[in-house]
Regions:
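Short acidic-hydrophobic, aromatic-tinged amphipathic segments that line or gate anion-handling sites
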Residues: 120-124, 174-183
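Active-site neighborhood of HAD-like aspartate-dependent phosphohydrolases
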Residues: 1-55
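Substrate-recognition "cap/lid" segment bordering the active-site pocket of phosphatases
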Residues: 94-139, 144-149
C-alpha cells in the first residue's frame, strides 16, 4: 500500500508546540490578546496578526519548534512496522515553505532517530491532493481539515488525525477520523 503522511501533528507533536509558542508570542511579545478561533489548525488563522508579525514569529521560533518536537506516541513504532510489512511511505508536507532550513533539520532528525525509512519526501507542498493523485497514494494521513477534504474530494482515501481542538469532517465517505497511531494501524489493516 502507498501511504502518504503529513509531518506536523501526525508524525511530530509540533502542533502542540506551535500552540504554546503562539500563545506566548501573542500575549508576551506582541502584548495582544488577538486569538480569533482556537479551532483553526494553522496559527495564521487562529490569531489576528499582521503579515510582519506572522513572519517574525516563523523566523524566530519555527526552527526551535521543529528541533524540540517529539514523535507522536506510537508513530515511530507503527511507521517502522508498516515499512517492514512492505508498505511504501511518502512524506507529503508543507514543511519548508517558510524556511528551507526546516527541511534539513527534519532530515537530520530522521537520520539521528533511525527513521530515514520513507520511499519519497515531498517538501513545501501546498496541493497535497495533486501529489496523492500523481503518486497513486492509496491513503493519506493528515491533521488538516482542509487538506483531508481536498484530498478526499480528489478521490484518495484519507485519515483525519485529530489531536487538538479543530473542526469535524462528518459528511465525506473518503474520510475517517482517528486519534492515535494505534487506531491508524488497526484501520490500515482492516482496509486490506
Amino acid at each position: 500500500m502507498k501511504i502518504g503522511i503529513d509531518l506536523d501533528g501526525v508524525i511530530f507533536d509540533s502542533e502542540k508546540l506551535y500552540r504554546v509558542y503562539t500563545e506566548l508570542y501573542d500575549m508576551i511579545e506582541l502584548g495582544k490578546n488577538s486569538k480569533k478561533d482556537n479551532r483553526e489548525l494553522k496559527f495564521q488563522d487562529r490569531f489576528d496578526w499582521t503579515d510582519e508579525e506572522k513572519n517574525n514569529f516563523l523566523d524566530e521560533y519555527q526552527p526551535e519548534i521543529i528541533s524540540q518536537a517529539n514523535y507522536m506516541p506510537g508513530a515511530k513504532m507503527i511507521l517502522k512496522k508498516l515499512k517492514e510489512e512492505g508498505n511504501d511511505l511518502y512524506i507529503i508536507t508543507a514543511r519548508g515553505i517558510y524556511n528551507e532550513q526546516i527541511i534539513e533539520i527534519t532530515k537530520n532528525i530522521f537520520k539521528e532517530t533511525g527513521m530515514d525509512i520513507f520511499t519519497k519526501c515531498y517538501w513545501s507542498i501546498l496541493d497535497k491532493a495533486k501529489v496523492c493523485k500523481d503518486e497513486n497514494i492509496d491513503i493519506m494521513i493528515d491533521d488538516s481539515k482542509y487538506n483531508c477534504e481536498s484530498i478526499a474530494n480528489a478521490g484518495t482515501k484519507t485519515i483525519y488525525m485529530k489531536d487538538a481542538p479543530s473542526y469535524d469532517i462528518t459528511d465525506n465517505p473518503n474520510v475517517v477520523t482517528l486519534y492515535n497511531w494505534g487506531e491508524v494501524y488497526r484501520y490500515l489493516h482492516e482496509m486490506n
